Every structure is written in C-alpha cells, then in structure tokens.
UniProtKB/Swiss-Prot annotation:
Binding site for Mg(2+) 1: 97, 539
Protein name: Phosphoribosylformylglycinamidine synthase subunit PurL
Residues that coordinate or bind ATP: 56, 95, 501, 538
Subunit record text: Monomer. Part of the FGAM synthase complex composed of 1 PurL, 1 PurQ and 2 PurS subunits.
Gene that produces this protein: purL
Length: 740
C-alpha cells in the first residue's frame, strides 16, 4: 500500500491541486476551519466535498434564482429527489443527473451507472422508480469514435434499466460537432410513492446506528466527484479508473430491500441516502449535517471487496449499489434481517454522537476528526467574472439570416434525413419501454406517459434541451427550453407540474461561460415562474470541454405533468381522415439556430427573438381545456424542423396524410418559433375549438389521403407519406454504418 504523505508533506507538495482543491481553499481550511494541517485522509475528504460536483461552489450563487416552491411541492432541492403532490395521497418523485465525463471515457459503464445512480436517488425518497428518460448529445456521425460512444452509451442505458425492470419511456438525441470530445449524457428517473412513505436523508438522535447496506466497497470511482469537476484533454482515456462499474441485479435487490423497509417498517428508520458522488463521505456528512448531529464511523467495519484499502480509498470510493441508513437504536438486527433475505450486506459502521464532529477510525487510529459543517456548509463560494460572449455582440450587428428554398420537396426530404430529426427507433428499441405494463405512451412521442395504477390518472414526462439556442442567447434559450418542455407535456393532454434540470456547461472560470450559465438560469427561472413549474431538483455539470474547447451551453429541462383522466390522453399521430388541422401559436421568422440553418449553411449564428411567456401560458391553458373536454384528436409540439417535421411525424403513426393550404412561405414551414402546436380536431368540435383558441389558432387544412399535399404562399408539393417515412427511418441506420 502506498505510503501516505504527512500533513507537512501535503502542505509542501500540494497534491490537493490535482484533486480540484485550490491553494486558497487549502489555506482557509487550515487557518480558519481546523486551525491545524489536515492529514492525507482529511485533505481527500475536503477535496471531494468541496468539488463543484458536490458543493456547487461556482454555481450556487445563480442557482438561488430558481423558483422552488408551489402549492404541490412537497420536497424541493436539497434531498435525493423532488417530490410533487398529485392528489389522493400520492406523489411523483423525480430527478435528473449528468454522467458526461464518465460516459466520455467509458461509455457503457458511464451511462449504466448514471442510470443506476439516479434510480437510487428516487428510491432513497421511499418511491418506487417507474420510468427513466435520457437526454443525449453527441458529435457528428461521420466520426467512428462518436459512433462507438453512441452505441455503447445506448447499450449501457438499456442494459441497466432493462435488468432493473424499469421502462425507458422517452428522451432526446441530438448531434453536433461541438460535442465530439465531450458528449452529454443526462438521465432522469421518475417514481411514485404514497406521501406517508416519504423519506429524507437525515441522521440524528444520539446513539442511533449508521448502517451501510448493499454492495461491497472497492477501488472503482475513487475521486469520481473531482474527476467530474475537471476539464478534459485529448488523453482523457487514461482516466477510466475514475469511472464506476455497475451491477443492475444487485441494485434490483437493493431497491426491493429498501422499499420493504421504508413502506413496511418506516418507524425503524431515521433517514436514508444514496452513496453517490464522493461515496461514503458525501452521504454520511450530508446526513449528519442535515440532522445537526455528530457522527463517528469505524471504517474497519465497512464491507470491502478488495484487501488493503486505506481510509482515503474507503471513504472516496464510488462503488455502486450502496445506501446509508440511520436506524433507530435497537432496530439494527430487524433491519439486518430484511437485507439478509436479499443476500445484501447490512452492517452497523457507526453511531450518531452528541457533538458536531465527524470522526473516522481505521485500524484503531483516528484518521479524521473535523466539524461536520466544514465539509458541507463552510465551502468557499467562487462566483466567477462574467462577460457577454463576443459572438452575441457580433451577431446583433448583422442582418437576420433569411433562408432561400427553391425546391420545397427536396428540402423537406433532406430535413427528415438530418440526424437530429430522423427516427431514433434503432436506438430506442434497445430499451424495454413496456416492462411492468404501466406504460401508455413510450419513446418517440412528445412525452412518455405512465398510468398511476388504481386511478384514472397518468404521469407525463419529457426531457428537452437545445444547446444551439442557449449558445446564441442564453436567457432567451433558457426560456425556450422550459416552453418546449411544457409544450411536450401539454401536447399529451397533461398539466405541467414542475421541472428538474441538468446544467451542462464548459469551464466556469471563463467569463463568457459563466455569463452563459448565469443568463440561462435567469431565462429558465423566468419561464418557470410564469408557467408555474417550480424547480424541485437538479444537477450542475461544469468543465465540459476538451483541449480548451467548450460544448454548447446545454441545460436540460426534465418536466413532469399530470394527466387527470387517461380517457383524454392525446397522441401525436393523426387519428382519422377528415379531421380539421389547426396551427396553434403565431409563426415568426425564427431561423437562427434552427435545423434548417444548420442544414443549409453548416453553421449556427444570429440573434433569437424573445418570447411572450404570459401569452403562451394563456393559450396553452385554453388548449389543455379543449383536450380535457375531449375535443382534440391529436396534438404535436413544434420544435426542430418546425411545422414541416411535425406534419410528417404526425402522419407516420397511421399513414394518414393531410391537405394543407396556408399563408406560410416555404421557409416559414421550417421556422422554429417556440410555443406552437399542430392539432387535429374532429369536425364536430372544430367550431368550438376555433372559438376557444380565437386568434391563437388558424385552420390550415384537413387530414386526408396518404400524402402531404402542401399549398403554400410561394410553392406547392405532393409528398407521399410512405416515402417520407422511409427516408426518416433509414437515415440513422445508414449513417451508423462504418465509413472507415
């Protein structure tokens, strides 16, 4: 075993600089918090807990802008996951997490453990996970390494979720060269619980037991939290040891054991928390801090699968499928019997103490004795300097880009073959979307929808993020992300309830990057306030750059909504011929950052038009009322590719075409003005629908035949649905074939 440095050697050689702890922070810990030099183990604990991934020291100042309260919110940010009341004593529990850095270096395990970690966050609240979603952003598919990364990532997501018996019901997948060296992998999990069973990550009550349950501890993932708080260079393949290894079968056992405990014997329990980033130190210190308690742990008692592990390694290991419990004194054996039944370790490794110190013993020696709050609450915040990106200033001085479309049919077909637009079926078929048979709507539609068993209710869920728009204007782009998510929820006939987020950005020490972070949060916060969708959980992933080149700022918004009656669930496919087609929302010249701009120019540039959030909220509510009255046959949110893509996708489900005649130009057919919907309405409800939506809906045609017959202001086209669908379905399989 390697000889650890002495406190004096640490001060002299500064190994903490490689663990994302700055010299200023180290000196502050020595001089202000401990009044002595920390030893090797203590220094490692501070480095992990003070990393951006655990502490949000860079981003905390802007995260405070988020609205987090509302009449349905039972638990906001700060716990394992957010909890939202859906009535009848039930709640929906959800959270999203990023696993970008691990996925970049070991994509299968990086993605798999991303799913595993977010599932544990949900069942640590006492909820049974019922669904997962993802948000994936990769480089262009002409690169062999990118194709490998994508295949392995999808396999990792599917492999873990399928083994757990939890359906993957939705998500998004986009492609842009900016993500080539640093893909974005965000996972979201949704669970359901009876409100009476809700748990918290809390440790208090002198003498109560700290119990370690689940898999044994190994050396995988050590310093994973600090790894996620660093930028990449082109040699990041060497960092695979920081990636955890998952075992979904072990997690399935852990899930069932934990739910048996929380649902049948909650009176034995004080608190429960997942061992995620920074492993034992994070879960234990956070639980003690939340309980305003002290804690003493004996690391010799921690179940270990490798010999000779140091205290440093035991505390910072991020081995998967582990939970930490605070159990009332006298019930330790009762809890152990539950976990014994599932053949899982369940060991008392410490006790709650009366003081406020965090004490660790290893091989009979005290290897850590520090105030609990020094790890969790005394972190030095580091807001960065800010500067508006120069490209925004330059673009604002230029005339807006106007596309020229000379051949509508050709452009339409090219659009459907774009990787971001094309069918993702070859990837989503990897996922089991129907396991446990609660899935009503699976991948490929605006929202995934699951029934709430024993009721007529459903839960709609979606993930949305478009880095191009955030890059062009972070604040407006942030608003658009929330509006897009709300549009997906509304299109299913659901009421938007709340959001979770993953904030994926570059190096926050760059003033332009921090400006993007700050202003995107401003935009998301504003939209959440207006649309009444508070932020209940989330995650920040910074330092997403390779060799100094940042990804697009890519916040992901995960939204959950309530379908009050599944009889009025709305799908995105045209249902019958002869229904009237309406375009809801006004169409503007919104081409900056659009799929059309990328396709025709190969670049992204320009300025975004702002949104009237109050107006959008108003007609969204009127549209939802029409859906709940049973007046809407189908609805599809308009996003990438605009009305053109939504028309095509709505026709693919049942092969029903449309005859469209409207005042839009060929270019406007591809405009990406946010907040719009394509709605089909049975003729008997058409007049009532038109009256309710008034000037916010215009009739553009009818469903009919087996082709899209378009008569626009400047061009016309007759496009067979079968031909369009073939292009759309075959594009990605063709691109994924080796070109080497």
């Amino acid at each position: 075993m390697m000889q650890e440095m002495t406190p004096e050697e640490i001060k002299e050689k500064k190994p903490y600089l490689d663990w994302s702890l700055s010299e200023e922070e180290y000196d502050y810990i020595c001089d202000k918090l401990l009044h002595r030099l920390p030893n090797y183990t203590e220094t490692g604990l501070f480095a992990a807990m003070w990393s951006e991934h655990c502490s949000y020291k860079k981003s905390k100042s802007v995260l405070r802008l988020f609205p987090t309260k509302g009449p349905r919110i039972l638990q906001g940010p700060g716990e394992g996951a957010g909890v939202v009341d859906i009535g009848d004593g039930q709640a929906v529990v959800f959270k999203a997490e990023s696993h970008n850095h691990p996925t970049a270096v070991e994509p299968y395990q990086g993605a798999a453990t991303g799913v595993g970690g977010i599932l544990r966050d949900v069942f640590s609240m006492g909820a049974r996970p019922v669904a997962t979603l993802d948000s994936l952003h990769f480089g262009e598919l002409d690169d062999a390494h990118t194709r490998w990364l994508l295949n392995e990532t999808v396999a990792g997501i599917g492999g873990y979720g399928n083994c757990m018996g939890i359906p993957t019901v939705g998500g998004e997948l986009t492609f842009d060269d900016i993500y080539k060296g640093n893909p974005v992998m965000n996972a979201m999990s949704v669970g359901l619980l009876d409100v009476k069973d809700m748990q918290k990550g809390l440790a208090q009550g002198e003498g109560n037991a700290v119990m370690y349950v689940g898999a044994k501890t190994g050396r995988d993932g050590i310093h994973g939290a600090t790894f996620a708080s660093h930028s990449f260079d082109s040699e990041h393949e060497s960092q695979r040891s920081a990636v955890q290894v998952g075992d979904p079968f072990m997690e399935k056992l852990l899930l069932e054991a934990c739910l048996e405990l929380t649902q049948k014997h909650a009176d034995w329990l004080v608190g429960i928390q997942d061992m995620g980033a920074a492993g034992i130190v994070s879960s234990s210190s956070e639980m003690a801090s939340e309980g305003k308690s002290g804690m003493e742990l004996n690391l010799d008692l921690v179940p270990q699968r490798e010999s000779g592990m140091s205290a440093y390694e035991i505390m910072l290991s991020e081995s998967q499928e582990r939970m930490l419990l605070c159990v009332k004194k006298g019930h330790e054996e009762d809890v152990k019997k539950i976990f014994d039944f599932y053949d899982l370790d369940a060991v008392v490794i410490g006790r709650i103490t009366s003081g406020h110190n965090y004490v660790l013993r290893h091989h009979g020696e005290v290897v850590c004795d520090i105030p609990v709050t020094s790890l969790t609450e005394d972190v030095l915040e580091e807001p960065s300097e800010e500067k508006q990106p120069q490209h925004m200033i330059d673009d604002a001085a230029k005339p807006a880009w106007e596309p020229e479309i000379t051949d509508l049919a050709k452009t339409y077909k090219q659009m459907l073959a774009q990787p971001t637009i094309a069918s993702k079926g070859m990837f989503t078929q990897t996922y089991d979307s129907m396991v446990r048979t609660s899935t009503v709507v699976g991948p490929g539609e605006d929202s995934g929808v699951l029934r709430v068993r024993g009721t007529h209710k459903g839960i709609a869920m979606t993930t949305d993020g478009n880095g191009r728009f955030i890059y062009l204007d972070p604040e407006i782009g942030g608003k658009r992300a929330v509006v897009e998510a709300a549009g997906n929820i509304i299109a299913s006939g659901a009421e938007p309830l709340a959001i979770t987020d993953c904030l994926n950005f570059g190096n926050p020490n760059e003033p332009e990057v921090f400006w993007e972070l700050h202003h995107s949060v401003m935009g998301i916060a504003k939209a959440c306030e207006v649309l009444e969708t508070p932020v209940v959980s989330g995650n920040v992933s910074l330092y997403n750059e390779t060799d100094g080149k940042s990804i697009y700022p890519t916040p992901m918004v995960g939204m959950v909504g309530l379908v009050k009656n599944l009889d009025h669930l709305v799908r995105d496919s045209f249902q019958e011929e002869g229904d009237d087609l309406y375009l809801v929302g006004q169409t503007g010249a919104d081409y900056a950052g659009s799929e059309l701009q990328k396709m025709l120019t190969g670049e992204i540039f320009g300025s975004l038009n702002d949104l009237d959030l109050d107006h959008i909220k108003d007609y969204q509510k009127r549209l939802l009322a029409q859906m709940e009255a049973g007046h809407v046959a189908s609805a599809h949110d308009l996003s990438e590719g605009g009305l053109a893509v939504s028309l095509a996708e709505s026709s693919f489900g049942h092969g029903i075409g449309a005859e469209v005649a409207c005042d839009l130009t060929s270019a406007e057919l591809f405009s990406e003005t946010p907040g719009r919907f394509l709605v089909s309405v049975p003729s008997e409800y058409s007049a009532e629908f038109a009256a309710a939506l008034a000037a916010d809906a215009v009739k553009i045609g009818q469903t009919a035949g087996d082709s899209l017959k378009l008569t626009l202001k400047d061009q016309a086209a007759d496009l067979p649905v079968a031909e369009l669908k073939q292009i759309w379905e075959e594009a990605l399989p063709c691109l994924m074939k080796s070109k080497d």
